[in-house]
């Protein structure tokens, strides 16, 4: 049987993503405080722009965590560091310049974390790269913010040392630095638009793409340990996806998608869950393991084709953009709770 659904490398990346979410929340908290403390209109406007970007980026990080499929808590050392920085920002030990300098270091830490997650994903699997893809937007935004924060620090530092304003060429240099890489900024998630979230079709399609990659990776591998790793992720992803659809989506579409078509979706997922449990009881090195996985993949991809054609069309024809975005938010929240439950279940030998 499959001895564990967990994988050490994937869990380590999940912890890094949890760290990034906690840091992003601190970054937002700092910038809200800076707006209350700043007396410079130009600096306030820059920080206000940062805040808008970073609130969206927090949504992107939350989406990536759900798509990644493993929920973890931030590391204790990171929680302690966040508490220490929060105390410094709330206190009077540091002046405004020093607080912004500490904040720029946080941005740098967030950039490096994002790059490390991307590099680690290249080693773990194509499905991980697919799940964390939107983090590229967060990384580019943070690099752009770093350049602007350097400009802010130059202005504040000159004022502190001389009591006078710095030369006006600072912002021009900052904009030139940003332009060197800003062309790569963009995201299919929420950044660069007025959307508050992805729509439900986009979120479900991302799940479909990821599990398809996992099936391909599993079938191409001859390493029982990697096969076990891929199946563990397939099991958790499909379980969370199916339960979230049955909680948030299917009951709501029945009225306009039709009783028969909706019931077919339920029936397909019931068969999928049955096969998942059967496969979990088979050793990854057994000859029939891949055959059963192939059977599961066929059922899943038939299900995918139905959802992405007729179901998505029915959703487009019956819901507003705001409604599909709200459904996406609720779907991700439901998946997150299910993932936390799955992560808390015993996954040692005998699973």
UniProtKB/Swiss-Prot annotation:
Molecular functions per Gene Ontology: metal ion binding
Binding residues for Fe cation 2: 245, 303
InterPro entries for this protein: Hemerythrin-like
Induction: By desiccation.
CDD domains linked: Hr-like
Binding residues annotated for Fe cation 1, in chain numbering: 241, 245
Pfam families from the UniProt entry: Hemerythrin
Keyword Iron (UniProt): yes
Key words of the record: Iron, Metal-binding, Stress response
Source organism superkingdom: Bacteria
Keyword Metal-binding on entry: yes
Coiled coil: none
Family to which this protein belongs: Belongs to the hemerythrin family.
Function description: Acts as a DNA nickase.
PANTHER family reported for this sequence: HHE DOMAIN PROTEIN (AFU_ORTHOLOGUE AFUA_4G00730)
Protein name per the record: DNA nickase
Gene source species: Nostoc sp. (strain PCC 7120 / SAG 25.82 / UTEX 2576)
């Amino acid at each position: 049987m499959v001895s564990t659904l967990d994988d050490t490398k994937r869990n380590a990346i999940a912890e890094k993503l949890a760290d990034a979410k906690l840091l992003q929340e601190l970054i937002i908290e700092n910038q809200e405080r800076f707006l209350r403390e700043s007396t410079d209109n130009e600096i306030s406007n820059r920080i206000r722009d940062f805040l808008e970007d970073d609130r969206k980026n927090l949504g992107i990080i939350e989406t990536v965590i759900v798509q990644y499929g493993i929920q973890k808590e931030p590391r204790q050392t990171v929680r302690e560091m966040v508490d220490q920085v929060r105390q410094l920002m709330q206190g009077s030990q540091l002046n405004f310049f020093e607080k912004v300098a500490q904040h720029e270091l946080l941005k740098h830490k967030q950039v490096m974390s994002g790059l490390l997650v991307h590099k680690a994903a290249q080693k773990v699997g194509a499905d991980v790269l697919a799940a964390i893809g939107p983090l590229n937007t967060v990384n580019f935004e943070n690099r752009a913010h770093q350049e602007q924060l350097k400009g802010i620090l130059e202005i504040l530092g000159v004022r502190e040392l001389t009591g006078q304003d710095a030369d006006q060429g600072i912002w021009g240099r900052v904009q030139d630095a940003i332009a060197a890489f800003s062309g790569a900024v963009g995201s299919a998630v929420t950044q660069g638009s007025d959307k508050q979230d992805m729509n439900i079709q986009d979120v479900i399609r991302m799940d479909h793409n990821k599990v398809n990659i996992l099936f391909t990776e599993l079938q191409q591998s001859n390493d029982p340990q990697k096969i076990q790793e891929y199946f563990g992720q397939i099991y958790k992803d499909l379980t969370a996806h199916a339960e979230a659809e049955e909680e948030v989506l299917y009951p709501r579409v029945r009225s306009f998608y039709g009783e028969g078509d909706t019931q077919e979706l339920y029936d397909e997922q019931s068969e999928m869950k049955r096969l998942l449990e059967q496969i979990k009881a088979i050793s990854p090195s057994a000859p029939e393991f891949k055959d059963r996985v192939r059977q599961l993949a066929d059922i899943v991809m038939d299900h995918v084709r139905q959802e992405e054609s007729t179901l998505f069309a029915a959703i487009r024809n019956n819901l507003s953009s705001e409604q599909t975005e709200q459904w996406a938010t609720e779907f991700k929240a439901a998946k997150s709770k299910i993932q936390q439950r799955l992560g808390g279940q015993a996954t040692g030998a005998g699973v």
